[in-house]
Amino acid sequence: MQEGKNIWSLILAAIRKELSEEEFYIWFENLYFIDAIGENIKIATPNSFHKNQVEKRFSKRIKEILIEKGHSTINVEFIHSQNELKDHNTESKDIPLKAITHQQDLQTKNKDIKTHAKNIINNTKQYSIKEEIHIKYRNPFLKKKYTFENFIIGTNNKLAYNASLSIAKNPGKKYNPCLIYGGVGLGKTHLLQSIGNKTEELHKEFKILYVTAENFLNEFVESIKTNETKRFKKKYRHLDMLLLDDIHDLQKKEGIQEELFHTFNALYEDNKQMVFTCDRQPSELVNFTDRLKSRFTRGLNVDISKPNFELRVAIIEKKAEEDGIKVPKNILNLVAKKVTTNIRDLEAAVTKLKAHIDLEDIEIDTNIVDKIIKEIIAYENDHTNTPNKINIENIKKVILRELKLTNKDIEGNSKKPEITKARHIYAYLLRNFTELSTIEIGKIIGGKTHSTVLYSINKIDKDRNKNLEINNLIIELMNKINKN
């Protein structure tokens, strides 16, 4: 059995390197090694929906990993049968003494779910029904880096900050629902996540769920396909706090709006806290049902505007300190003066300054700052002004021409590094130049899954901040797409 556990740990370690943190937790946190007989490893899943999705998305890759690690004859089987789980858990001969003691302790102690999440690879645990119940509502999308303590307060966001902190301390009391609105990169997600983290700290018994509107939509669509809508409704209507990010992504999508309407009513009637974010006021949402818009305005609506000069300087100084770089005050002030868009762009400018210092071993002067700012402004213009004007075929033509690829390369399943990289870039550009969802982008790129597309987008986004070569390539491709 121990060998089986070790093999499963190898699989988890390999997959974790290939997925974003969010993807890994959402698909693998609730999986448990339960048995290894001969060359067959059994892994428990929380429900049939989860089982089907893991098999569909990862079975092929798991087999490839087993072959790579020299375990080609091993088979991994995912199960969710409660009878089989009970049979296994009652057979003490298959359960080590440590596991039996662990299960007995669970009857008298509340398990620390956070510890489980961190130790999922190093300490794969024996499956137990009690443990599954506790973990069911743990939110993998709450990131501990977002706190009220490291949120920089200014006149543009003070009201939103105070309201968010009040909600975390007294959920479901004063401001329910609450909607925070404002442009991209101004700190809406930071506040939303901070609410979740602070509430989790103060109200440990609360079932809190943070989710983006896109993931909410994708999960709803999957639940329809797999006939699991009851599970979906139960998940979202039995929460203590729902944190729904970017509700503007639900425009023109009537089915999910209907579902959100009923979810809203169920939570509101039970005095459960809801917080939403949006890039505009509810009244400005297009193709959104009036009754749902009226629900959003039932509580508190608070905006976050662009940071003023003083706040921009504070943000830049904090980011520079976090990144461990020393930049003259006049350079930081120059960045603050010229980058007036949002917090995300300010932090991106500091990241690029660090890259120049680390990779080129040069001192930063005004010429380098001007170059960096031009890149950021060019990207911002591309991102905000062209989504509806760029033809998908134009994006594809530029990718194929500039990267010297064929249709078969970009839409196939080749694992060659240069082709895989090109597909990541293709997904990233489609996301930035169009309003296509990740599911729609996946269909264009040879039938890739939502998770695969999301991984590609996140990877290029991260690489742009760390790798000057990648960043310059993306800017060059963007410019050629605009001219094409």
Curated annotation (Swiss-Prot):
Transmembrane segments: none annotated. Residues 141-357 are annotated as: Domain III, AAA+ region. It is found in: Cytoplasm. SMART domains: AAA, Bac_DnaA_C. PANTHER family: CHROMOSOMAL REPLICATION INITIATOR PROTEIN DNAA. Plays an essential role in the initiation and regulation of chromosomal replication. ATP-DnaA binds to the origin of replication (oriC) to initiate formation of the DNA replication initiation complex once per cell cycle. Binds the DnaA box (a 9 base pair repeat at the origin) and separates the double-stranded (ds)DNA. Forms a right-handed helical filament on oriC DNA; dsDNA binds to the exterior of the filament while single-stranded (ss)DNA is stabiized in the filament's interior. This is Chromosomal replication initiator protein DnaA. It comes from Borrelia recurrentis (strain A1). The lineage of its organism: Bacteria, Pseudomonadati, Spirochaetota, Spirochaetia, Spirochaetales. The gene is dnaA.
